[in-house]
């Protein structure tokens, strides 16, 4: 498997990845950022997995059930066949709360004959740090580790527990189930209860997708991407994760491996900007409440990222005992970027606040809190916009005056002005308008490079950067402006490699990037569309989505040479950009 051919299942509490052959290779319980119970994804030998071994006579295919996040893996031979339905339960209960327990259900449905299989159940708790022992009990199989950390995992099944635990051959004469739970169940699961969980979860996802608008072009891609973004939302707090994994490398064998199971203000704000346009306003409201909860008073500084349970310190650690995906070390947990200064987050957040308040001016319970946050951000931007920062790409060395950061400082003030006008709160209006113009003049004077005929990565630099393409999307410049058109063409010429974009080409902390950052190619395609090159944009879009995996899922990066998917998976950035680009191209049609 060389293309991250995994399906994601989840319930907005945690998620799991199932390979195209039905092996559960990544799962963290009880929550997204908990220690793994299966991590074959990060160490083929030590990580642990949950698979079905059926022999070479079977062909295996995998799809999602209808427009849902229930994954179906079908095993077929001439004599027998069966289907595995993998999902994490999620549905609304009678009291209107959501049932989303930390458990994975694997429902086996016999469709022909009497299939034979061996169950390879090999959990490795706590990132496989110590030995995990398996014990057969009366009602369940329990996995236990108590060396470095104490943890347990409970497996319930309608099949012989002894045959499962010892990986003995099993003949399927009827449908069967596995329920793997972080908690010991008070009421034992049965085939009836499993079927009920399946039907309720199926109904939940069909209802969710039914409330998503349909598009004439690329509808299935938009739907799958929207569902993926929903899976990356954490219902308990409203946080939105950058991805479901840690340490999948941007380049095989190199060290750009990061833990993405956190909530970046930038990434999450971009997600809700798009998902709100699809009518899913609950995610937007939950996320903005997450931000409000993080800033309880006016002196609280906004970090670039947080833990999904609002943690503010995300200490980075290295798991030296794991070999890494395709032997790409290190495997990291935590992320040291939480302490960085990135000035672009302010504008991206206030843009989302403005979008929400325009939509729901008279139906937003927290509009006073959002107005307070807006004023606080405007004050911070006014004090600090002239200072350098680490930029959108989180350079770990020196600070610079990044063009994208400056543009988003302008966005912060521009949207603050619009919000003040919306509520007729005009006491700061003149001061903000003066500041808005000062930032804009500064960018136009210092970010434009006459020799390159483009807005460049940072002031005084000749380096080009894909993030500058967003100047138009955020309203800083018109798509018909000759300087923007020239910038788009310069970036296309300088940063494109076989139709895929570099974020930038100048060497960073780890040398020259050797893979394409997927969202950047979407940004470029979007820009081509905006400047009138619609057919070229459509051609490049259809080529790019061809690099997604068998289920239409995308990771953070694509290798320039092999076109294999790299980086954490599935990636919110990639899927939000896919939606935005697909919608814009659909409108252009």
Where are these regions (language model features)?
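Acidic, mature catalytic/reactive cores of soluble proteins
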Residues: 1-589
